[in-house]
């Protein structure tokens, strides 16, 4: 362990020294810059919490980017991040709960499960509970309180890691207003779904503040046979306070403190439905899931210090600390007899309910489980339902700083950025099983397990990241070059289920170290006043885990278990595109090609695995595709009627080049496609605004999806059929303070399948209508 720590400290100190040299050199150049050059410098003001800041910035990057503006979010009144992202080309999502509470997001064909292969940020800070040691965790910032969402892909994302293959998503929270503002945004509707979002804030010369509270709850659209619904409740409280100087000359300082608390209590489950039950009653919940409940608590603290010497030179430093607790108490397996072999997981039962009929009858409450033993020592050997407490604690903390330097040298515009981050995160698993008997469709506790008897380990990561990005513009050409460095040290301490008190007598330690140099290069050229071309190439990277096991299958189907140090995910990613931007018409067409030398998968319970989260080597793979978006406003800006139109389309083709076997994916044969990646997605939005009234319609088409690796025609039991969903919204602005809203989702009340995982079939949200008000005082 001392060597593990000393190596890390040596690299950290060397990079801090290198960063200091860059900063000193930049500052010296900035001091020498002439005043008239400063006055001619065009500066786009972007807050410290944003990476794009506007649609204009997104359209003028050397790589692919999309900015979901506050106006765009307000159009449809969405609270579901899946629906917010539907218009963004290159994004694949598949639903799980119907409300976007735990989204599965893929960017350019990365694995979608638990959004584990994207860099997720809130206000530019890593938002996942443990992005290095356990990226597939059950936390996603509440989309209902965000004022903007930023998506960067391709060579646009070298500053944002550790995941650089697909892209990054930055959730931009409510900012401190420029003047006094109090706002209420409340909706109520189908299934007693309530959203109440209130915020108040103000800004003076030397300070500003903002406080907001979000309450989001619903009875849910799934119900038990007794018509009892299974819903959720969420609370979110955020406060920001900033102090600053306001000099007209010289350096200015500001410090902003952000504190947040969020919780959730939901009756969510992993238990889906059988094929036949889904066809009859798609919104049914089996009584065997009546005890399933997810409880989460999240705390965040962020301090942001901004030092701005001039419009050309500024430094931004963030100190952050996040904690996340979650206990998903959910049905794991069913036991029919007293023998260990008479036990089946819920995935096995629902995949073949006929063969596992005795287990399914207990799960569905058709028959009671028997009790053979009454003494405490043997209670756990009884038949019944085993409910697992997936009890976990996470923390992440770190400090990151960046320096930005802009200048004009003759006909050249130069924009340099250097960044450095030191980060630590940890996942603590301490899980157990409880045994319940089924009697008269009610679950009764028989035996309570010992904490730590199912999983009992701590995984920690220390990471040092540094990057440099330089953009040079000369006449019609812009060249962006970047370099990122990641040094990661992982350590897993498995106390084993035999040492639930964690005495350390049976502790197993496994470690792994990863280093990566990640270059990127992007070009942007203005072919004419309205037409531009761009291209980029960059290295994709994803941190490894500590697992060292790999199962390889030969041509005859024989499995060989290999022991090796797990390598990081690595790929070479290429993109090229064209942009057209006229007054009322804008379009973009991009082709991308991601060539993996080593793709990583994860053993997720959400994908039918054992839930260890251990990563496994998939090996070589290719993901390629095309992204298209077009925006058109037929009428001039000063016309009383506006009818904005937007069309986006994504084509994605995936292929794994190796044969292997895993807990999550089973047997994979070379040529198989990656599961849960849409080959075709299309989104169309149509709006109409006249005077104080506004109407918007969104149409989303999702092509057929493969739920397990395979090739050729998709088998019916491994398929999510294609579907088209219509959403709509209407607004009436009564006066400058009050606006009335009506939002609908799934306007045609279509019953559609969204997932066959974690266990069984799941339906998307049925028709929902929600009336609301937006009231502002300023």
Residue ranges and their predicted role:
Residues 181, 188-217, 225-269, 293-310, ...:
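Transmembrane beta-barrel wall of Gram-negative outer-membrane proteins
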Residues 82-129:
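Extracytoplasmic beta-strand/coil segments of soluble accessory domains associated
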Residues 394, 412-425, 450-595, 642-643, ...:
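Structural signature of Gram-negative outer-membrane beta-barrels, strongest in the C-terminal barrel
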Residues 43-76, 101-104:
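N-terminal periplasmic "start-of-domain" segments of outer-membrane beta-barrel proteins
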Residues 308, 314-320, 324-328, 526, ...:
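Membrane-embedded beta-barrel scaffold of Gram-negative outer-membrane proteins
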Residues 473, 488, 586, 591-600, ...:
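Gram-negative outer-membrane beta-barrel transporters
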Residues 125-153:
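Short acidic/polar hinge/loop motifs at secondary-structure boundaries
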Residues 248-255, 296-497, 588:
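Face-selective signature of the C-terminal outer-membrane beta-barrel domain
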């Amino acid at each position: 362990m001392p060597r593990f720590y000393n190596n890390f400290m040596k690299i950290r100190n060397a990079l801090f020294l290198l960063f200091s040299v860059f900063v000193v050199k930049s500052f010296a150049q900035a001091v020498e810059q002439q005043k008239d050059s400063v006055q001619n410098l065009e500066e786009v003001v972007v807050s410290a919490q944003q990476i794009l800041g506007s649609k204009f910035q997104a359209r003028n990057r050397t790589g692919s980017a999309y900015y979901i503006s506050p106006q765009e979010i307000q159009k449809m009144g969405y609270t579901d991040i899946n629906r917010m992202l539907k218009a963004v080309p290159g994004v694949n999502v598949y639903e799980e709960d119907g409300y976007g509470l735990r989204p599965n997001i893929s960017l350019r064909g990365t694995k979608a499960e638990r959004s584990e292969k994207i860099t997720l940020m809130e206000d530019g800070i890593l938002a996942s509970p443990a992005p290095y040691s356990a990226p597939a965790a059950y936390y996603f910032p509440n989309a209902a309180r965000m004022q903007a969402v930023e998506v960067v892909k391709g060579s646009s994302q070298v500053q944002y890691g550790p995941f650089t293959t697909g892209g990054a998503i930055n959730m931009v929270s409510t900012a401190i207003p420029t003047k006094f503002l109090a706002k209420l945004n409340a909706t109520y509707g189908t299934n007693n779904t309530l959203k109440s979002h209130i915020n108040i804030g103000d800004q003076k010369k030397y300070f500003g503040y903002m406080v907001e509270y979000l309450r989001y709850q619903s009875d849910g659209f799934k119900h038990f046979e007794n018509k009892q619904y299974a819903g959720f409740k969420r609370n979110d409280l955020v406060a920001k306070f900033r102090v600053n100087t306001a000099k007209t000359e010289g350096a200015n300082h500001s410090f902003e403190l952000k504190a947040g608390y969020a919780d959730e209590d939901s009756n969510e489950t992993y238990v889906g439905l059988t094929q036949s039950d889904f066809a009859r009653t798609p919104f049914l919940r089996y009584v065997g899931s009546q005890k399933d409940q997810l409880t989460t608590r999240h705390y965040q603290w962020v301090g942001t210090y901004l030092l701005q010497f001039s419009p050309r030179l500024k430094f931004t430093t963030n100190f952050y600390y996040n904690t996340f607790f979650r206990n998903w108490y959910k049905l794991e397996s069913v036991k029919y007899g007293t023998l260990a072999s008479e036990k089946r997981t819920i995935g096995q039962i629902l995949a073949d309910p006929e063969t596992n009929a005795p287990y399914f009858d207990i799960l569905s409450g058709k028959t009671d489980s028997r009790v053979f033993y009454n003494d405490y020592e043997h209670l756990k050997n009884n038949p019944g339902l085993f409910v697992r407490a997936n009890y976990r604690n996470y923390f992440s903390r770190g400090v990151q700083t960046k320096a930005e330097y802009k200048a004009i040298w003759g006909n050249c515009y130069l924009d340099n950025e250097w960044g450095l981050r030191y980060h630590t995160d940890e996942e603590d698993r301490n899980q157990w099983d409880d045994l319940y008997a089924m009697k008269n469709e009610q679950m009764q506790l028989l035996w309570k397990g010992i904490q730590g008897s199912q999983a009992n380990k701590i995984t920690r990561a220390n990471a040092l990241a540094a990057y440099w990005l330089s953009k040079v513009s000369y006449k019609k050409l812009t060249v962006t070059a970047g370099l990122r460095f990641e040094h990661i040290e992982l350590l897993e301490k498995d106390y084993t289920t035999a040492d639930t008190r964690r005495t350390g007598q049976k502790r197993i330690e496994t470690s792994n170290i990863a280093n990566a140099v990640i270059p990127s290069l992007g070009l942007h050229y203005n072919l004419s006043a309205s037409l531009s071309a761009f291209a980029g190439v960059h290295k994709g990277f994803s941190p490894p885990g500590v697992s060292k096991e790999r199962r390889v299958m030969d041509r005859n189907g024989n499995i060989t278990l290999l022991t090796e140090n797990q390598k990081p995910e690595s790929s070479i990613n290429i993109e090229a595109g064209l942009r057209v931007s006229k007054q009322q018409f804008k379009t973009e067409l991009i082709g991308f090609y991601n060539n993996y030398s080593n793709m990583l998968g994860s053993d997720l319970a959400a994908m039918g695995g054992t839930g260890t989260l251990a990563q496994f080597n998939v090996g070589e793979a290719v993901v390629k595709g095309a992204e298209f978006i077009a925006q058109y406003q037929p009428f001039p800006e000063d016309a009383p009627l506006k009818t904005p139109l937007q069309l986006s389309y994504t084509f994605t083709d995936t292929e794994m080049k190796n044969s292997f076997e895993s807990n999550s994916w089973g047997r994979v044969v070379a040529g198989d496609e990656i599961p849960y990646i849409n080959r075709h997605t299309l989104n169309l939005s149509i709006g109409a605004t006249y005077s104080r009234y506004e109407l918007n319609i969104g149409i989303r088409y999702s092509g057929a999806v493969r739920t397990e690796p395979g090739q050729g025609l998709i088998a019916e039991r491994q398929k999510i059929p294609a579907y088209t969903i219509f959403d709509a919204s209407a607004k009436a602005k009564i006066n400058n303070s009050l606006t009335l809203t009506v939002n609908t989702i799934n306007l045609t009340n279509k019953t559609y399948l969204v997932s066959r995982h974690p266990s069984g079939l799941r339906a998307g949200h049925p028709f929902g209508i929600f009336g609301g008000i937006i009231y502002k005082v300023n």
